[in-house]
Amino acid sequence: MQQTDALLDRFLAGLAPASPLAVWAHGSLAAGDHVEGRSDLDLIAVLPQPPGPGAVWRVAVLHNRLRAEPLAGGLHCTYLSPDTADDAGRRHLTWAHERLLRRPVTPVTRAELHTSGRVLHGAPPADVLPPVPDGELAAFVLRDQRDYWRPYVDRADLWTRDVWVDLGMLTHARATVTLREGRLISKREALDVLPGLGAPEEVVEDIRHAATADRSRPTRRGR
């Protein structure tokens, strides 16, 4: 993953003047099923204090300078501070989809960081983030399935699109395991769960093929 490592090195070097206390990877980069050129780079940076206007500007400059780097479009980073890390509902400064926004660090992400987070710099997640109670994790996963995904089930037009089929089915499989067993699984592991939930084997294999394909090359479904 030479391009991935080069981008991470550039990002860490650019962030160094902000004196981050920690930088972590979560998602596929930490879970071991990252595919260079297809998977996103999901990061969390812990700054000494909540970013004020000047720090927000410097974060924007950093990410804009990285725009021309290979894979930079998939680099997402949320910025925490020790004073704000405890609140799972708080919205934090985030760079995602090539723009600044604010969003929370969900119980799923927090649990991922504790179980499989990859330390790129500084302190480990356990030194900054409180553990996620089992009830809080299960409640969030159930709410996400019920309030976000369930209303889309009746939108037949969406389910002819690869991204909805892939993400929807994998998310449902992962949620099912979390609710039944109280643990998180990766997208790769979710593929093995799908047949037991009634997913057609042909669709599962198509998702598996797409998940391991280079984003720049066409897959069977013409991505």
Q: Regions from the language model: what does each represent?
A:
Residues V61-R161, M169:
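Conserved NTP/Mg2+-binding pocket subregion across the NTase superfamily
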Residues V153-R188:
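Hydrophobic alpha-helical packing segments in soluble, helical-rich domains
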